[in-house]
Every structure is written in C-alpha cells, then in structure tokens.
C-alpha cells in the first residue's frame, strides 16, 4: 500500500488539478472563479486564488466526512505533529479550543483552567454548561504579564477536584513562556483526567529541539494549534491534534463538525496542507534561522538605554520552565511611557505594526517570514524611541499599575450569561455580579468573565487600561460608561 510522503500536498495538489480541468460550475460560490465578482477586487486577489475558492463537491471530498484528499492531508498532519488524529479547523484556533472543552465537558462538569485563558475557553464553558475551577497563573511583577500555571497549583487543583473532566493548559503563553508540560500531563493522567492544550502560539515548537516541548511530545490528549499564527498558513486556519485514550475521537469529530460551517473554505484548507509540508520538511532549518535572527534582535534591544527584552534569565521558576526566543517582548516601563504609546509611535513614525501592546510592553513576533531588513528597521526605530523619550526616563517618570486580584466566581458563567440582567453605571458596579465579558484584546484574556463579583480594584484596572488607550472590549456599551450585571430583586415589604 502506498504511503504518502511529507513532501506531498494531496489537498492542494488535487485543488490545482481540479482548477486546471476548468469545469463549468453550476454550484456555489456564485462568483464563479471571480467572473461574477467586483473587477477591482478580482484583479487584486488574482485568478488562481479565486479558481480554488470552491465548495465540497464530490471530487473535492468533505471536511465534515473526509474520505479522500482531506483525509490524506489530515493524516499527514497527524504524522507530522505526532498525533493519532488531526482535524483541520477553518473556525480558527477558537473553534478548536471550543471543540476540546465541549468534547470532555457537559452541564455541571468541572474543568480546571488557568484564569488567564482566552475568551474562547470561557465561551465553550458557557455553551457546555461546565463549571470552571480557576487556577491562578504566576504573575511577573516586573513585566506585568501572566506566565503559565505551576505544577504546585495543578497538584492542588487535582487533589481538591479529582472529579474534574479535564485540565486545560496554555503552552506556550502569548508571551512565549512554558511550564513543565510533561510533568503536568503525567500528574493529570494519574487521576485519569485528560489534558487539553491551548497551543495557539506554539505551532513551531514541535519542530525544533531548543523550543518548549509541544503538547503531543508531552503526551497531552488534545491540542488546539494555530498554524496560521506562526506556521505559514492563512489567517483563520488551525488544527486540532488528538491522542487516543482518555478522549473519544468520534465524539471530538462530531463536536468540531457541529461548530464548523458547511461552506468550507478550500483556500484555508489548502494553506494548512502546504504549511504542514514546509514545517515537516524544512521546519527545523527555518526555525533555527528564526531563532538566530530573534536573538540578534534581543541582544540589540538590550543595548538600548531604558529598554529591556527578556530572555533566558527569566527561566528558573515553575511557570517559566522554558521559553520561545522568537517572541520579542520589549519592556518600555523604564522609558516612562506605556506599551500602547510605544505601539502608536512605531506605527506613526516607522510604519511598524507590533503584535500587541499592554501597559508596560510591546510584543513583536519574529517568524521565518522575516529578514534582517525588517528587524534592523525595528532596532533603529527602538533606538529612536529611546532617544526621544529619554527625558521622561531621566526625570524618573514611571508607569505604575497594580494588577488586581482575580475576581471571585459567584455564579457559573452559563447561569450568569442566561440570567435576567440590568444595565447600571460603571462607577456603581462594585459588588455586583457581571454578566458580560470584559477584556483587553489582544490578547483576549478576560478581566471579568460572566458570573464574577465586580471589585473596585478591577474597575480601576479597567479605567487605567482605557486611559492608556488599550482596546478594552466585551461589554455591550463600548464606551464602558455602563456594565451589564445580574438583576437584583428587593424583598416584598
């Protein structure tokens, strides 16, 4: 029996062959290879892309019931990532994360999650009716960012909630730090609890020994992995890797099908196929070059007065067992400006767009799509930034914001989300139970999640983020003059 090679792209190749046959199409999409589309957009996108913007007709397989080229592409991805099964997601990693949670949890089931999870985890908890048991991540006081969860916090949570249906871990974090995932997996498996990994920012780590251990290498049961973020596929295309044992693979397939559009994007699927090929066949060399380039940037930034780019010196705690050096965190705290101010300045003065900013930092991602031309421009821009804002630093101006305690969960997120609610002024909200998500996006980590008790400290933290110009999102009232809370009833007198 013929076995496909990692150098092959069964899905992409079949799409190209189909387009070359130039069939007469009496099926959707209605633009018919671009002929029925606005000419300006058609010219910009190009004929080849529009020719493979197709639908799941018989010759092209079906993502919901793959038997041909999609199955072959998914099987190759499973082999490349060390999984037993891989499912392509065109709902992004958010769709894959929601699939993981809903595959193991039903109404009332407990799931152990770090409090710094992405909104998609909380959305899945609301849909499933699961009860989140929050584990507090380690906070870095200097950088003002959350790291991963520690082995101690996982052990404590497992001892107190041994009936949990799943443990969710972020590996690595948005900022590139990773805990000892292998030990966490072993600990959870000793309780027969499956480990679900949010690997949104770690598609590349599987392909280089110097990077943190990947979810599949660590023995995790499922991992939602963003190929588009750092692996070279198109935006919104991701994969869900699964190992057999503690999870029901057929149930996983049913859930991801429920959450996936039936109008499948073959352009996104093809981009996953070719990205897998490149990672599997060239990934190690490409990532090695990327690491070297990123380290050059890190060293150069640390030579700039008042700027700091963390590296290996951050390692040594349970939550910082390893890190991804391709994530360039630039702390501007000592310059006396916020990360958001630095982001805006870089955009306006150098036409540079960063991944995200927060109160203290900007985050830049170096991938194998970068060259020294781009990184040298970044270094020059940061040198200029330091020189311009040096006066504030010399005067001792410092941005200081206390990170508040995690709010107490009073109601399950599902109960809170579907409860009767009312809208009250922002300044009167302390002590009430929130019905909305409130988060800074990116990274999309909730400040409040439905069901939590609003505290004055957290309201002040939101206000500080707003004053700094950061994108606070979630509430119906985008001005944040009001918040939606659970309705209170007064007793009948």
From Swiss-Prot:
Pathway: Amine and polyamine biosynthesis; agmatine biosynthesis; agmatine from L-arginine: step 1/1. InterPro entries: Orn/Lys/Arg_deCO2ase_major_dom, Orn_Lys_Arg_decarboxylase-I, Prn/Lys/Arg_de-COase_C, Prn/Lys/Arg_de-COase_C_sf, PyrdxlP-dep_Trfase, PyrdxlP-dep_Trfase_major, PyrdxlP-dep_Trfase_small. It catalyses: L-arginine + H(+) = agmatine + CO2. Its main location: cytoplasm. Its cofactor is pyridoxal 5'-phosphate. It is an enzyme of class 4 (lyase). It comes from the Bacteria. Keywords: Cytoplasm, Decarboxylase, Lyase, Polyamine biosynthesis, Putrescine biosynthesis, Pyridoxal phosphate, Spermidine biosynthesis. GO terms for molecular function: arginine decarboxylase activity. It is found in: Cytoplasm. GO terms for biological process: putrescine biosynthetic process; spermidine biosynthetic process. Its EC number is 4.1.1.19. The modification N6-(pyridoxal phosphate)lysine is found at residue 229. GO terms for cellular component: cytoplasm. Catalyzes the formation of agmatine from arginine. Belongs to the Orn/Lys/Arg decarboxylase class-I family. PANTHER family: ARGININE DECARBOXYLASE (PTHR43277:SF4). This is Arginine decarboxylase.
